[in-house]
């Protein structure tokens, strides 16, 4: 009888451990295309899961967005974020903080660049993520605000933004 109870206890513990491991992401790298979001109107992103816990995961993400000079938008955006992901199986809540580096040019009358400089915006992320722990498809929707400043004319300026993304994990 003692052996039976011990066997049942071991089976229960083993299945509990296996169930928790199934919440970890199998694929720790991903590429994503985002409309809106931290790259303003669009961005291509690479993400790496740094800490892969049962419920809590931490990721680092870097993206890039380029806008031609004729668009009137800052030329280059490079958003860099650290995200904390809380998992409920295949559904996740994301909370992130970062900085969107921008590289832009002052242009002359013929639209030729005369002076390039790095600037940027503080940015964040609060959103939903759909990704099965062993799946490759990633779907995301998030509130992605920007904080601009300080400058000679404003202390800080808040810009509300949002984005949706689709990605592939590998």
Residue ranges and their predicted role:
Residues 1-23, 166, 170:
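Bacterial Sec-dependent N-terminal signal peptides
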Residues 6, 17, 32-33, 113, ...:
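A general structural-boundary detector
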Residues 19-75:
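Short glycine/proline- and aromatic-enriched beta-strand/turn motifs that initiate or cap beta-hairpins
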Residues 53-59, 66-170:
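Outer-membrane beta-barrel transmembrane domain signature
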């Amino acid at each position: 009888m003692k052996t039976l109870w011990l066997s049942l206890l071991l089976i229960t513990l083993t299945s509990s451990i296996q169930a928790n491991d199934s919440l970890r992401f199998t694929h720790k790298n991903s590429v994503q295309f985002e409309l809106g979001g931290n790259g303003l109107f669009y961005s291509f992103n690479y993400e790496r899961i740094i800490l892969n816990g049962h419920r809590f995961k931490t990721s680092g993400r870097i993206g890039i967005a380029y806008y031609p000079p004729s668009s009137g938008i800052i030329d280059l955006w490079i958003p860099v974020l650290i995200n904390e992901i809380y998992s409920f199986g295949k559904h996740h809540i994301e909370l992130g903080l970062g900085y969107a580096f921008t590289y832009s040019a002052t242009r002359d009358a013929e639209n030729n660049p005369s002076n390039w400089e790095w600037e940027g915006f503080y940015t964040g992320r609060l959103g939903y993520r759909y990704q099965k722990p062993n799946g490759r498809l990633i779907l995301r929707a998030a509130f992605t605000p920007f904080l601009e400043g300080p400058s000679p004319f404003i202390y800080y300026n808040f810009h509300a933004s949002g984005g949706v993304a689709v990605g592939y994990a590998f």
